[in-house]
């Protein structure tokens, strides 16, 4: 492996013929909301990461790092993940314009909301922005996972347990709806919400406005739709559903 130390934004170390080197996979965990990242010689940007009309705020470098990651990915096949504070999902002004542009290019494949207080030096919650240039033209939307409640206390910090990580990975691999946890948000819904990607807009927290099936309460039984919503578990254990449930009457 080739390891280099330098200023990612001001003086990228991986370049070729005056342009950024590109890779199949890129992963980044940049400093959150870095201030004063923009130097006078970075506009226009010789690496074409940003333009004057799509320029991250000088006092907040979150989108500068995300744009650098996207530019470092191979065209049409590059994949990447960047850990950033939740603010990138909904902040306005220049960041709104950049977010809208990235969304309209269908680069974002998924967003994973993480618990608060899991990183040293900050207690704010973060999210993993998953970028995938492959099949972007056929992508129907963004797969959103709300994993903010999956953690354990570990001294003064929160920590992801193995089962929390497995829950995230299994949900991502299955790409199926799990109520209150994950689902595919289609482009039309994102556009309707004015390109706001705040996770709480799309994933309903447990304990708020849960719809009750009155028929099930009165006569007993479990709605068949509730059983089908657990498809991720039935795929993992194909014979389990028939052992636990049977058709009592229409829809239950």
Regions found by a protein language model. Give the residues of each.
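Conserved SAM/SAH cofactor-binding pocket of Class I
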Residues: 1
